[in-house]
């Protein structure tokens, strides 16, 4: 583990509460995985406890083992297993049982499969939408090795938001990400979704992995040029001694600056930026929900999301 002492602003309350327990039991009963648990997300207690609504969880599809080995990620690598054909229906059933009106789906990378899992991902989206079309579905997808026909399968399934994380600036892609990933490849996925659909696009950047400010600025510009609508920025935290060291703990005020730059200068519809923000951060979901479901203006949706996140 990094020898750097974590600053006070990174300390979180442990997860608890009846809502948290109910969601955990439902997931266990249906043999489902969440990225919240597998990636040791620090916001799990906040999201699952439903502080600002019915609660949310990010379902991780296609198993709990990834075909790639990114140096920041706590998900296990290798030992890939066959897909569970019942998983799409089980996820949809759990969404209904928990009572979610906004669900996030992500997955491990499955480079071992012919379609890299795109068909399985699309079936899960359709299962949820067929049961209740009013549920908003956000998907955080792999890069599918840049194969646009596989990205198109996701688009055709009709999610409300498609996210794909660029993770870090161009110079730090290696050693941060697996060598099969890449800056330009991730940009091309996001650009394709923007060009071929009206679906909202979203991405995430980790800070504290050795990047410089001018590189973050450049990355924001590249993302906006690709048509990305929503961006989140958060602090990288080292999951274990075997993972990438933390280069720097970025002060909350710097995150506030990046939020202003992203929205006011580059014109992102929304930017959630803070030390504990993650790609599926709830404030971002609240923004999208307010725009898509309630028809609020971008400015009003921003205010509502930030007010809820600060309460």
UniProtKB/Swiss-Prot annotation:
Binding sites annotated in the UniProt record for [4Fe-4S] cluster 2: 66, 70, 73
Listed GO CC annotations: cytoplasm
Involved pathway(s): Protein modification; protein lipoylation via endogenous pathway; protein N(6)-(lipoyl)lysine from octanoyl-[acyl-carrier-protein]: step 2/2
SMART domains linked: Elp3
Keywords assigned by UniProt, alphabetized: 4Fe-4S, Cytoplasm, Iron, Iron-sulfur, Metal-binding, S-adenosyl-L-methionine, Transferase
EC number from the UniProt entry: 2.8.1.8
Top-level taxon in the UniProt lineage: Archaea
Residues in Radical SAM core domain copies: 51-269
Residues engaged in binding [4Fe-4S] cluster 1: 36, 41, 47, 280
Localization of this protein: Cytoplasm
Pfam families the record matches: LIAS_N, Radical_SAM
Enzyme class: transferase
Main localization (coarse): cytoplasm
Recorded GO MF terms: 4 iron, 4 sulfur cluster binding; lipoate synthase activity; metal ion binding
Cofactor: [4Fe-4S] cluster
Keyword Transcription regulation: no
Cofactor note (record): Binds 2 [4Fe-4S] clusters per subunit. One cluster is coordinated with 3 cysteines and an exchangeable S-adenosyl-L-methionine.
Stated family: Belongs to the radical SAM superfamily. Lipoyl synthase family.
UniProt cross-references to HAMAP family, sorted A to Z: Lipoyl_synth
NCBIfam families on file: lipA (TIGR00510), PRK05481.1 (NF004019), PRK12928.1 (NF009544)
Protein name (database record): Lipoyl synthase
């Amino acid at each position: 583990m990094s020898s750097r002492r974590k600053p006070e602003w990174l300390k979180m309350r442990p997860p608890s509460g009846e809502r948290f327990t109910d969601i955990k039991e439902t997931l266990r009963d249906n043999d489902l995985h969440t990225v919240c648990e597998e990636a040791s997300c620090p916001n799990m207690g906040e999201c699952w406890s439903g502080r600002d609504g019915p609660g949310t969880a990010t379902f991780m599809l296609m198993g709990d083992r990834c075909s790639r080995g990114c140096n920041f990620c706590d998900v296990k690598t290798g030992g890939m297993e066959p897909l569970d054909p019942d998983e799409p229906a089980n996820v949809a059933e759990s969404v209904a049982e928990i009572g979610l009106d906004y669900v996030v789906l992500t997955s491990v990378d499955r480079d071992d499969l012919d379609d890299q899992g795109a068909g399985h991902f699309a079936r899960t989206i359709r299962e949820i939408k067929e049961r209740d079309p009013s549920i908003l579905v956000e998907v955080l997808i792999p890069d599918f090795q840049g194969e646009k026909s596989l990205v198109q399968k996701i688009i055709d399934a009709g999610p409300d938001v498609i996210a794909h994380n660029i993770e870090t600036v161009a110079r730090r892609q290696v050693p941060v990400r697996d060598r099969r990933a890449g800056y330009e490849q991730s940009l091309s996925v996001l650009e394709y979704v923007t060009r071929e659909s009206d679906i909202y696009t979203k991405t995430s950047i980790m800070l504290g992995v050795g990047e410089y400010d001018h590189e973050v600025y450049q990355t924001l510009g590249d993302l906006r040029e690709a048509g990305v609508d929503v961006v989140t920025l958060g602090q990288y935290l080292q999951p274990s001694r075997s993972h990438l060291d933390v280069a720097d703990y970025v002060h909350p005020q710097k995150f506030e600056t990046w939020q202003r730059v992203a929205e006011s200068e580059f014109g992102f519809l929304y930017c959630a930026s803070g030390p504990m923000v993650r790609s599926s951060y709830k404030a971002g979901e609240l923004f999208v929900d307010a725009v898509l479901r309630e028809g609020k203006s971008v400015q009003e949706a921003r205010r509502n999301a930030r007010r809820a996140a600060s309460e």
